[in-house]
Regions:
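Anionic coordination/interaction segments
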Residues: 1-343
Length: 343
């Protein structure tokens, strides 16, 4: 039995201590506590159904079956040569103030302009904060940063990598040309192409300007003075002679608390089809347990996922498998490493 196995493995010193082994009698545990234990458990092994190897086999089969559900269209990815005109907001330096190789103030001094690309990046992260009394967001020149509600440290809506030389975004807009299969990110991170990434910082707003695949892109980000909401307005203009069919995928890494790792498995995601809204709540956050975030879009969501492992697959944030699939799996994030991704 379990107690004998613990004794034989000389692990008795780990009994009933944090991070150790707890032997509990099911008959002495309330139904509510048992449900809680099963909810937060990373793995459940039932001896009535066989040994550990049998349980692991069931988990593996379930995992493989889940990832076979949606066909993968990752056949030949075509990258067309980029010969379109580039956008450079620092081109007319005579009209700018305090110009340097990275940026300058606009002629009226009300905006600060930054230009970056893969070969010319800022020596450190430039952060810009837009906030009201309850809600705020921080964005960087690479479109990194995070969002918070009520408390910027204890109640982060999305993840934050506070590193001066690494700018890993937790809120990303991916764009895919459905015909050429070319994919890029609207910000410099995490999937840059060879074009310039221009940023305009103003009082209470930020604009990201980019041109790729003959598509002019502008994203304006701001937080209203009173409302607890982050608004992003995306404008696309096709400069090609032919029509373009694009897929736009929005990705975010929800935390809804202080620690990203502690939130894993406890983010409950729900999709309201009638209102075109995805809601999420951290069931393990006692201080802000009643807070619910929502993500919506002016266009109808085609599919979504709350499963970070499904979205990344064998790839990563710079090359997620989810962008190669015809649709996402429409699954919740509960019990998994969470994300909110939709197209």
């Amino acid at each position: 039995d379990i107690e004998e196995a613990v004794l034989n493995s000389q692990l008795s010193y780990l009994k009933n201590i944090r991070g150790g082994i707890f032997e509990l009698n099911k008959n002495e545990i309330s139904k509510e506590d048992m449900n809680l234990l099963q909810f937060i458990a990373g793995i459940i092994i039932d001896s009535k159904k066989g040994g550990i190897s049998h349980s692991l086999k069931d988990i593996e089969e379930e995992y493989l079956e889940k990832y076979k559900k949606i066909p993968n269209e990752s056949e030949n990815i075509i990258i067309e040569p980029e010969n379109q005109e580039n956008i450079d907001i620092l081109q007319n330096t005579e009209n700018l103030k305090y110009y340097n190789e990275y940026g300058a103030f606009s002629a009226d001094g009300k905006e600060y302009l930054v230009k970056t690309n893969k070969d010319n990046q800022l020596p450190t992260v430039w952060s810009h904060i837009m906030a009201n009394k309850k809600f705020g967001t921080l964005v960087t020149q690479s479109m990194g940063g995070y969002t918070w509600y009520k408390n910027s440290r204890l109640n982060r809506v999305t993840a934050w990598e506070n590193q001066p030389n690494f700018d890993i975004p937790s809120e990303i807009i991916y764009i895919k040309d459905q015909e050429t299969k070319k994919v890029w990110s609207l910000g410099l991170n995490p999937m840059p192409d060879n074009k310039n990434y221009n940023v305009v910082y103003g009082f209470g707003y930020t604009k990201f300007i980019h041109k790729s695949d003959g598509i002019e892109q502008e994203l304006e980000v701001f937080v209203p003075k009173e409302d607890s909401v982050k608004i992003q307005i995306l404008k696309l203009k096709n400069m090609n002679l032919n029509r373009k069919k694009l897929k736009i995928v929005y990705y975010m890494k929800p935390v809804l608390g202080e620690d990203e790792l502690k939130s894993n498995g406890y983010i409950d995601l729900k999709y309201d089809k009638n209102n075109n809204i995805i809601c999420a709540q951290n069931l393990y956050n006692s201080e802000f347990k009643n807070d619910v975030i929502y993500v919506s879009n002016s266009e109808k969501m085609q599919s979504y996922t709350g499963d970070k492992n499904f979205f990344f697959g064998n790839g990563n944030i710079s090359n997620p498998d989810g962008l190669k699939k015809s649709s996402l799996n429409n699954e919740n994030s509960l019990g998994k490493k969470p994300c909110i991704a939709y197209e």
